[in-house]
């Protein structure tokens, strides 16, 4: 009977919680702002963790790159903080990536809304022409 979650998934969940707390409490750089950790992917050998983040209230590409760079420079420090929370032999190396899925989701949602509105207007036009 297979397990519902493998070890790398459990470590990823624990790292996500620990990193969220560590970034909020330990990172004092105002350029980073409010960070939302969307996902953490840990390799099967538990050596590397990819952390996907977004920044609340930041839309500027340059500011996003700066914030990701700051987080990557602090990755060693954050790894040390996380290692104190986790009870595993070695803590995965951390690398931060900007998560573009939220932005893509908003674009797709607006496209769908626009298509629905156009479809409704075409159906109303067709209904109006049939009555005449």
Swiss-Prot record:
BP GO terms, sorted: maturation of SSU-rRNA
Q: Which SUPFAM superfamilies match?
A: Ribosome-binding factor A, RbfA
Q: Which InterPro entries match?
A: KH_dom-like_a/b, RbfA, RbfA_dom_sf, Ribosome-bd_factorA_CS
Subunit and interaction comment: Monomer. Binds 30S ribosomal subunits, but not 50S ribosomal subunits or 70S ribosomes.
Q: What UniProt keywords are attached to this protein's entry? A: Cytoplasm, Ribosome biogenesis
The free-text function statement in the UniProt record for this protein reads:
One of several proteins that assist in the late maturation steps of the functional core of the 30S ribosomal subunit. Associates with free 30S ribosomal subunits (but not with 30S subunits that are part of 70S ribosomes or polysomes). Required for efficient processing of 16S rRNA. May interact with the 5'-terminal helix region of 16S rRNA.
Which residues does UniProt assign to the signal peptide? Answer: none
| One Pfam family of this chain | RBFA
| Chief location | cytoplasm
Q: Which GO terms describe its molecular function?
A: ribosomal small subunit binding
Q: Which cysteines are joined by disulfide bonds?
A: none
By sequence similarity, the record places it as follows: Belongs to the RbfA family.
What protein name does the entry list? Ribosome-binding factor A
Any idea where this protein resides? Cytoplasm
Query: What cellular-component terms does GO give this entry?
Result: cytosol
Say yes or no: keyword Cytoplasm present.
yes
């Amino acid at each position: 009977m297979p397990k519902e979650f493998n070890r790398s998934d459990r470590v990823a969940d624990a790292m996500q919680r620990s990193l969220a707390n560590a970034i909020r409490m330990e990172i004092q750089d105002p350029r980073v702002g409010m960070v939302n950790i969307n996902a953490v992917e840990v390799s099967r050998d538990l050596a590397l963790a990819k952390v996907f983040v977004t920044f609340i209230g930041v839309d500027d590409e340059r500011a996003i790159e700066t914030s990701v760079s700051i987080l990557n420079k602090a990755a060693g420090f954050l790894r040390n903080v996380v290692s104190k929370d986790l009870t595993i032999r070695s803590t995965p190396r951390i690398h931060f990536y900007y998560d573009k899925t939220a932005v893509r989701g908003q674009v797709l949602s607006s496209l769908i809304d626009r298509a629905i509105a156009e479809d409704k207007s075409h159906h109303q036009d067709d209904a109006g022409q049939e009555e005449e």
